[in-house]
Amino acid sequence: MRSKFKDEHPFEKRKAEAERIRQKYPDRIPVICEKADRTDIPTIDKKKYLVPSDLTVGQFVYVIRKRIKLAPEKAIFIFVDEVLPPTAALMSAIYEEHKDEDNFLYVSYSGENTFGQEGWVELPVDDMDKAFICVSAAKKHWVWVLCDVRSSYQNCVLIVPLVQRPVLHTHSSFLSVSFALLFV
């Protein structure tokens, strides 16, 4: 996603501002937060944030939710370099890994998972035709995963209500399953 902040401010000015902020507030992270294109989520009233370095991504999402006055039942997704960061990660770690060459961290938010999320996960399942796996997601929300083991484990769907790297619970043997995260 192209940053409007970058378009509106020359590189030298952005870099000087970020360096000044880091010198004055060494325990704060300079963050630019902008709404992603083509989303119906409200626009945030301010783009620049000085975030405590010990704040988690999940806590930052909470701040953004409050700033845009998003209803609790509505989903919000934040992206850093078009990737969903783990909600338990510290903003300082995300900053060190993803800061721009101007020393700002650029975060976009959306009401949809616009970039998708795919990957591999070890799912523990019993040896049966169909297995239900209980998953604990952010804030202890419980969801279920249905795997049709007769079709080479290709029909596994994980549905979680919030952005979160899932923690899987159950017993038995492990198997690798390709999955796509679908957010509701």
Curated annotation (Swiss-Prot):
SUPFAM superfamilies given in the database record: Ubiquitin-like
Annotated site, Cleavage, chain positions: G116, Q117
Keywords attached to this entry: Autophagy, Cytoplasmic vesicle, Lipoprotein, Membrane, Protein transport, Transport, Ubl conjugation pathway, Vacuole
Top-level taxon of the source organism: Eukaryota
Lipid positions (Phosphatidylethanolamine amidated glycine): G116
GO cellular component terms, A-Z: autophagosome membrane; cytoplasmic vesicle
GO biological process terms on file: autophagy; protein transport
Membrane topology: Lipid-anchor
Propeptide: 117-184
Subcellular location: Cytoplasmic vesicle, Autophagosome membrane; Vacuole membrane
Role: Ubiquitin-like modifier involved in autophagosome formation. With ATG4, mediates the delivery of the autophagosomes to the vacuole via the microtubule cytoskeleton. Required for selective autophagic degradation of the nucleus (nucleophagy) as well as for mitophagy which contributes to regulate mitochondrial quantity and quality by eliminating the mitochondria to a basal level to fulfill cellular energy requirements and preventing excess ROS production. Participates also in membrane fusion events that take place in the early secretory pathway.
A Pfam family of this chain: ATG8
InterPro entries xrefs: Atg8-like, Ubiquitin-like_domsf
Family: Belongs to the ATG8 family.
Listed name of the protein: Autophagy-related protein 8
Modification after translation: The C-terminal 68 residues are removed to expose Gly-116 at the C-terminus. The C-terminal Gly is then amidated with phosphatidylethanolamine by an activating system similar to that for ubiquitin.
